[in-house]
Amino acid sequence: MLSIFETVAAAAPVTVAETQQASNNENRGQPGYYCLIA
């Protein structure tokens, strides 16, 4: 449970930043992949 919450909490802000940068390249289906990497 803690690991899931930590992952979501850490991925939330990163996903926003990655989405803004990925928006220039390819933002189709990529956010999920970036979220996993984060």
UniProtKB/Swiss-Prot annotation:
Domain of life: Eukaryota
The keyword Membrane appears for this protein: yes
Lipid-bearing positions (S-farnesyl cysteine): C35
Coiled coil: none
Propeptide: 36-38
Keywords: Cell membrane, Lipoprotein, Membrane, Methylation, Pheromone, Prenylation
Location(s) in or outside the cell: Cell membrane
GO cellular component assignments: plasma membrane
Principal subcellular localisation of the protein: membrane
An example molecular function term from Gene Ontology annotations: pheromone activity
Topology of the protein relative to the lipid bilayer: Lipid-anchor
Modified residues (Cysteine methyl ester): C35
Keyword Cell inner membrane: no
Segments crossing the lipid bilayer: none
Role noted for this protein: Mating pheromone for A2 allele.
Name the record gives this protein: A2-specific pheromone
Encoding gene per record: MFA2
